[in-house]
Amino acid sequence: MKINKEDITIVILAGGKSERMGGQDKGLLQINKKYIIKHLYNICKEYSNEIYVNANRNLATYSEMGLIAWKDILENYQGPLAGMYTSLMNAKTKYVMTLPCDGPLVNHIYFKRMIDINSDFDIRAAHDGDRIQPVYSLIKKDLLNNLKL
């Protein structure tokens, strides 16, 4: 079974403080003079009609790029889980897929593995061979009440 693109909202998580990067908004990083977030957005377009950015600053800049940004519902930069919660609250689709804005190497293989499912699930998370990478997730919207912070 494959999940249809009409059933997925994809949210690129860019709402952090970026303390390890001196406060630079990771969503606005560039490689070869191209914004990473636009690169990710362009890949996401193949897998969903509903693509958003979760950001807590520079919302006007994202808008100028043609992106729609959702600010965290919870205040004070509470981390990626707050972005996931905001995404589940705002999404109108059955599934929400999240990925971080600072992962430019994500490719079509990742998306295909996440949406080509052969069993029922509530949440799927990527695994890099050593650890689970929970910000790379596909979550049923039904889990929203379980996540309430």
Spell out what each predicted region is.
Residues K2-L149:
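Nucleotide and nucleotide-moiety/phosphate-recognizing core
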